[in-house]
Amino acid sequence: MDNTPDQGSLKAHTLHPKSVTDRLAIHPDLTRRLLVDFIRQEVRKFGFNRLVLGLSGGIDSALSATLAAEALGPENVVGIMLPYRTSSPESEGHARLLIEQLGIQSDLIDITPMAEPLFEHYGGELSNLRRGNILARLRMVAVFDRSAAENALVLGTSNKTEYLLGYTTWYGDSAASIQPIGDLYKTQIRALSRAVGVPTPILEKKPSADLWPGQTDEGEMGLTYDTVDQVLYLLVDERLDPQYVVEMGFDEALVSRVVRTVRNNQYKRMTPIIAKVGSRTPGIDFRYPRDWGH
């Protein structure tokens, strides 16, 4: 999104929508092995050997759990189902299907008693978005607490499309110790999930954060993953100027919206900014590798 015109023009003439789809294609086995090794190395690097994650019944958490079970063994992975009273029974059923297939440890925590007092306090002023964010943050409270009890790290389940668009709850579902699938677009998640044997009902369902009855990701965003992933790939990975993405045949309003959304949500991808007062400031000039001291 910050290319010079000449660079963008050159790429625009060498890329076409079909080739974008081809470039988004992944090598499933290589990607699987890379992510399994990543999970195993990162968890053990910090002296842990167990992971806890929230299981929504969706494809992202299903893939994450599958990779974690291969990396650490199913006995070292704990999947937590965290329904609210309006959550889809189908989602819980899909989560249980995955748990049975993988043989991982599991638990169910109904977050309704946690959420209702807060919802009652705010009354009718709460929008669906605010309610959904509250539920996402309550779920992460439960998952992190369970990780402490298990002496485990929290496994993230966010994908690259969500990160770039900011389609995530800050300090909710985006909060985790490691994020193995964070550099895979949603369409790539589908391909890898199919390759590693995620159950068919999960593969075929419409993506949904299950934040309120009938909610779907694509319906809420007003975008399809197939299209938005191509636009994001061109803007981010290929670093094309937005105008050249339009010249390739993508809708101008869509491209403009994606650019605006990515830029407006940059703050969600950053750690909190610290005001510099002293001579060495964490995150500015006091910076060491994450495994410093281990």
Give the residues covered by each predicted segment:
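ATP/NTP-dependent adenylation/nucleotidyl-transfer catalytic domains that generate, transfer
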Residues: D2-L53, L63-E70, E75-P89, G93-H294
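Conserved G/P- and acidic residue-centered "switch" motifs that form tight phosphate/ATP-binding loops
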Residues: G58
